[in-house]
């Protein structure tokens, strides 16, 4: 759930709506909050209002240092961090900073979410674009932090991606939404989600 006091993306929810959603799910459900904010004071204020189990940091990775991530964890004991790791399309691994980021952030991250980063965007993910899965595999093999793969995944390709990378988990945003929704918003298509889960479990 993406939420915050300052509206940063079209689909971001208000603090009030995020709180309603978190309070409405089953007790055993893991509540994940997402932010692209790069100011830990802004993030802190949001977390004081609505505290998830896991915070997905999906903004410009260089906008929040590992030391600042550690400070967030110190302020909210028990909060787990899922750090997005950006992967560029059509760029060889040796020309990317993904492995460097992994080494920098693994001491303060509970999970990595490996996702496609568009050339024109500061934040990571929500592109619907895939990338070279051998890069995912290299990242996964380089760290003990559980890695979730993302980027252009749907029911048609997720099993192959799992077979190629053996990740901790998989994530889909763009390609499991309805095809036609109001501009700037997204809405999950239950049939696409069901197919995605079934394909994932079959891998």
List each model region and its residues:
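Short, conserved glycine- and acidic-residue-centered signature motifs
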Residues: 11-14, 129-132, 186-189
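Conserved anion-binding
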Residues: 2-7, 24-29, 41-47, 54-142
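Glycine-rich beta-to-alpha transition loops that act as phosphate-gripper elements at the mouths
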Residues: 34-40, 85-91, 149-156
């Amino acid at each position: 759930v993406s939420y915050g006091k300052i509206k940063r993306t079209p689909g971001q929810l208000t603090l009030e709506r995020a709180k309603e959603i978190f309070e409405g799910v089953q007790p055993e459900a893991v509540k994940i909050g997402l932010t692209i904010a790069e100011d830990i004071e802004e993030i802190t204020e949001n977390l004081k209002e609505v505290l998830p189990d896991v915070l997905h940091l999906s903004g410009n990775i260089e906008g929040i240092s590992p030391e600042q991530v550690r400070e967030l964890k110190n302020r909210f004991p028990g909060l787990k961090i899922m750090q997005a790791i950006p992967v560029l399309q059509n760029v060889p691994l040796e020309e990317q900073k993904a492995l460097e980021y992994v080494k920098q952030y693994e001491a303060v991250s509970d999970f990595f979410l490996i996702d496609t980063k568009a050339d024109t965007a500061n934040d990571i993910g929500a592109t619907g674009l895939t990338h070279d899965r051998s890069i995912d595999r290299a990242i996964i093999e380089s760290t003990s932090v559980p890695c979730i793969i993302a980027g252009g995944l749907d029911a048609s390709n997720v099993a192959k991606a799992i077979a190629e990378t053996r990740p901790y988990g998989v994530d889909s945003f763009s390609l499991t939404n309805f095809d036609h929704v109001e501009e700037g918003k997204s809405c999950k298509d239950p049939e696409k989600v069901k197919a995605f889960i079934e394909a994932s479990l079959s891998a």
